[in-house]
Amino acid sequence: MSLNSLTYPLRYEDLSLDTDPEIRLDIDRIDEPANSEPGFEGIIGRSSALRSVLQMVETVAWGDSTVLLLGETGTGKELIARAIHSHSPRRDRPFVKLNCAAIPTGLLESEFFGHERGAFTGAIAQKIGRVEVAEQGSLFLDEIGDIPLELQPKLLRVLQEREFERLGSTRTKKIDVRVVAATHRDLEGMILKGEFRSDLYYRLNVFPISIPPLRERPEDIPLLVEHFVQEAARKLNKTIDAIPSDSMAALTDYQWPGNIRELENVIERAVILSRGSVLRVPRRDLQSRVTAGHSGAKLETLADVEREHIRAVLKQTRWVLSGPGGAAARLGMNRSTLYFRMKKLGIVRPCF
């Protein structure tokens, strides 16, 4: 049975290997022509929502305009940034990534602009910053909403004047680099709170592209499942060639607050746990996810859905956040992102 001839839902109890209840997965295909748009290998999906994004990528790629990618965590913003670079005249030049949320504030300026020997305590050698490494290429600034206020004027200078100085140097260096930034945060709301400069926002927001969450492109989920099964099976040296139809239906119906990253994590765990050639998504895990998306009481906002889902996973893991079996891994996030989401959603660890 192919992915184009799905019949579901079926009762899980009725499934057996000799009744053809599974969707056959074409895991031997290498180039995945049916899963990706031509020229966008690695970006999986054929939905109209994704095609709209890729059309915008093709439109903006050939210029040098700054691009701002907007979307929830785990939606694939880095893949879109790389697609912009690979479709641009700078494709043969460096693509340099800097995650503004992953580097301590005290080190971020040095990562951006570099430093001279002796610029500060511990600077025992000259360091070339990411801006300089990206010369004639593209600089991808992930989580731009987390850049400290004191560093924002210097980034604005790079965008406006195309120049900077290394820390500890008075020599101004000219730079030729295209900036693509990304964030899951509400930058306009941050401006109103005094947390983000409006002039920097306007420089970044020349060509915004909104990346749709996975729940808005459910028709892409079977293709993503096939892709992630293929990747995980190869990595783990296993053979998985089918998935129960009701499992695929449940995966497709679920809202995926962690988006593609969460789906990838769920599939890898399922491949690890599957003993035969049929993908077995843990029934308890799958049922908790489906319940979160199909509860009797309709939740008012997406934040409510996300809050309840994170709480459910935290209870399953006994509030253990780290490690391969922790809540962060189950949700497809890193621990710092989970801490941030818990704080934002008002989730407090109970006293045991």
For the regions a language model picked out, list residue spans one by one:
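Conserved RecA-like P-loop NTPase ATPase core
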Residues: 53, 75, 98, 112, ...
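Amphipathic HAMP/coiled-coil signal-transducing linker helices
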Residues: 26-41, 294
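Nucleotide-binding/hydrolysis machinery
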Residues: 2-22, 40, 46-48, 88-93, ...
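Base-recognition residues in the alpha-helical recognition helix of bacterial helix-turn-helix
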Residues: 153, 157, 165, 334-340
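Conserved helical "switch/dimer-interface" subregion of ABC/ABC-like ATPase nucleotide-binding domains
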Residues: 56, 87, 115, 154, ...
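Bacterial C-terminal helix-turn-helix
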Residues: 2-9, 13, 297-352
